């Protein structure tokens, strides 16, 4: 379900503080975040965030196309190792 327009996008308050501090300092370090549910805002464009996926922080460089999406969309939590092969084909 889509969030109603009158509420506006959800962004963690601590995330806004970290992004503003990174913009003010001019440094391009990876900003570690755990808030996968936060919406990517236009002021985050050009910054790199380390989005936690349950094991490690996946670096996500934000660009214009990502605005409006959630951080969790760009940090997959599950790894697919493929289905097992056909046992009949291996024996032959």
From Swiss-Prot:
The keyword Ribosomal protein applies. InterPro entries: Ribosomal_uS19 (IPR002222), Ribosomal_uS19_bac-type (IPR005732), Ribosomal_uS19_CS (IPR020934), Ribosomal_uS19_SF (IPR023575). The keyword Secreted does not apply. This is Small ribosomal subunit protein uS19. It comes from the Bacteria. It comes from Bradyrhizobium sp. (strain ORS 278). GO terms for molecular function: rRNA binding; structural constituent of ribosome. Keywords: Ribonucleoprotein, Ribosomal protein, RNA-binding, rRNA-binding. Gene3D superfamilies: 30s Ribosomal Protein S19, Chain A. GO terms for biological process: ribosomal small subunit assembly; translation. Belongs to the universal ribosomal protein uS19 family. Coiled coil: none annotated.
